[in-house]
Amino acid sequence: ILHSGENVNILVLDTEGYSNTGGQQSKSTPFGASMKFAIGGKNSAKKDLGMIAMMSGAYVAQIAMGANQAQAIRAFREAASFNGPSIILAYAPCIAHGFALQNGPEHQMQMVQTGAWPLFRFDPRLIDEGHNPLTMDSSVDNPMPLEDFLKTESRFGAARAANPQFNKLVDLAKANNAYKSELKKHIAQFAMLNKPVVKENGEAELWYLLHI
């Protein structure tokens, strides 16, 4: 769908697991989280759907309503006005995460502050205006310690008790968050360098500039 060019809007409610079948791990489950089929903590990175979607030329946004309502509303408006495929990734708390859901807004704020769930908007229309299409709406310059956040969810506490290598998983998670933050910036720069060039007959010609 994202590569179709059709004017469709997609909303993904990301619970970071298979919540409708009992809380099994999925490709969306983050490093170190204890889920069914990963009791000792998932030992691989969370699939970054946002980064994949950015490569398709679609409008992409990642939101957390409890952390920043204004950013979420702006993302919905931009996605609706985008003439092409758009996708919004919304963090959706789940009982399987193991925290008091009535504290959802505060919890989402903490998740954003750690850099585990960065808020951003990627609008390809800005490329035609000569602007960077990627807007980071949350700062990770001075992030909340990831370890402090993990202590608030039992899905990580269970993994800590079951896996003697849990601290290593935490280190991998922090490194992965930082890596993906930088990679998104490079993808945005790549998109700007590879905008379609219109030929005299009106057809678009796309040149890919590879940096080796």
Language-model features: locations:
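Active-site proximal loops enriched in glycine and acidic residues that flank catalytic Cys/His/Asp
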Residues: V12, A64-M65, A90-A92
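Short gly/pro/ser/thr-enriched loop/turn and capping motifs at secondary-structure boundaries
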Residues: T15-N20, I95-H97
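Glycine/aspartate-rich loop-and-adjacent alpha/beta segment that forms the canonical ThDP
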Residues: A72-D171, K184, E200-A204, L209
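Conserved thiamine diphosphate
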Residues: K27-F82, K151-F156
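Glycine-rich, charge-decorated loop segments at or immediately adjacent to ligand/cofactor-binding or catalytic sites
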Residues: S19-T29
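Conserved beta-strand scaffold positions in the cores of enzyme catalytic domains, especially
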Residues: I10, V60-Q62, I87, L119
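A short alpha/beta connector and helix-capping loop motif
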Residues: I1-D14
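Short, amphipathic C-terminal "tail helix"
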Residues: K174-P196, G202
